[in-house]
Amino acid sequence: RMAEELLLSAVRGEGKEHGGKVVRLVFFTFCEDNREYQLQRSFLEQWVDDHFVSPRPVLSLVAQKPLVGELVMEVHSLPATAGEEVTVEEQMTSSVRYLRVTSGHYREIIAGGLYADDLTLPVREQSEQVFGKAEEILKAEQMSFGDIVRQWNYLERITDIVYGNQCYQDFNDIRSQFYASSE
């Protein structure tokens, strides 16, 4: 119920002077396990599909309980611009939906919620899948990892040691590998 109220506020605010075009929704909430994460994510994705017209905002669900409350929603929007035409297009690779924002000589790619197909895999394999999806988007847009301006990653139990490796180190090794490909 709380998620639906938050989502409705984003839909109501879209297109208004203060809001603009909603391009990304980021939710923070506690998830008991991967099953609950996938259920909540599926609910949110379906809700966005049902209530927004194309181009629909991309969605991220961060399994981290907010300091206050049970659910927090962060809304990213593009303000309406006077005299400058901004185009937001919904794009799809074989596995990921993302947005392409263009204006004059400017182009921005907005993706969200990239996650591994199997959340039970070790961090190294999940990281390879996620960065592979990011690479797929970048190649479709004729870009490279060197073109990324802002990237935010959430790793569950980042300091855990699994199979003798720290989760963060495994993630960082894969990230470095993909970023090195654009040097």
Where are these regions (language model features)?
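Short, polar/acidic, helix-capping and beta-turn segments at strand->helix junctions
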Residues: 1-183
